A protein has these predicted regions:
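Glycine-rich helix-loop "coupling/hinge" segments at transmembrane-helix boundaries
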Residues: 178-208, 212-213, 233
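Short helix-to-coil transition segments within interhelical loops
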Residues: 130-160, 200
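Cytoplasmic-entry segments and transmembrane alpha-helices of multi-pass inner-membrane transporters
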Residues: 55-92, 114, 119, 124-128
Length: 236
């Protein structure tokens, strides 16, 4: 129908509109790639990071299931990965990325190094959150005959949730920066936009806008994280 065709043409015209010499379609595509990388990597990284943090807390000296060997292995792994700059980690594990996904280029391929990078980072942050829980609460749970799983699910995690939200907020900010670096190696996203269409083409206004967008995203994330954490602490 004519109205429908007119709407399609209008949408195409809007997508082809250029802002700082870059089409709106390209801006939306790269922005979506960043959200995709950060969202998926954060989800997987949070699960792995939480499991690693629980191992560190439960298996430490005096923990609920003390295991010095397992604690030392996990702690060493976390320290080693965290000590490697992300850009070096990105290049180093390219063979692993290729083995898993068959390619090292694209937003999906960037998920592998991003998850490897963020998991140990979140593990340390979540470990600190879990260690903030009063030992008296755990001792009371043990005295009531609660199992290790019940202590984790009903006492440890709920008490640490407010602090964990702040930890995840910090991790998300770090992940946002890492995703921008991933763009340098073909990961796409805002970083790729700034480098390919900004730096390499001497498009300074686009680079400035990219930085401003990243700053705004970080501020919004931090504000949201602080607010959620405060509410969780109040209703604990």
């Amino acid at each position: 129908s004519s109205p429908r065709k007119g709407g399609i043409r209008l949408m195409e015209a809007l997508l082809e509109t250029k802002i700082f010499k870059v089409s709106v379609e390209r801006l939306l595509l790269n922005g979506g790639q960043t959200l995709y990388m950060v969202g998926i990597a954060l989800l997987i990284g949070t699960v792995i990071g939480t499991l690693l943090a629980l191992v560190l807390v439960l298996c430490r000296k005096g923990g609920l299931v003390e295991n010095k060997v397992l604690h030392s292995i996990v702690s060493l792994y976390i320290n080693v990965v965290r000590s490697v700059p992300f850009i070096i980690l990105l290049v180093t594990i390219m063979p692993l990325t290729r083995a898993i996904l068959g390619t090292t280029i694209g937003s999906t391929a960037a998920l592998v190094p991003l998850v490897v990078y963020i998991s140990p980072y979140l593990a340390r942050l979540i470990e600190n959150s879990l260690l903030e829980v009063s030992p008296g609460i755990l001792e009371a749970a043990q005295a009531m005959g609660a199992t290790t799983w019940q202590i984790i699910r009903c006492f440890l995690m709920p008490e640490a949730l407010g602090s964990m939200v702040l930890a995840l907020t910090t991790g998300t900010v770090g992940l946002l920066g890492a995703s921008a670096m991933a763009g340098y190696c073909g990961g796409g996203g805002i970083g790729d936009l700034a480098l390919t269409y900004g730096y390499e083409k001497m498009n300074t206004p686009l680079m400035i806008v990219t930085v401003i967008v990243l700053v705004i995203l970080v501020q919004l994330l931090q504000m949201a994280g602080n607010r959620v954490s405060r509410r969780l602490r109040e209703h604990r």
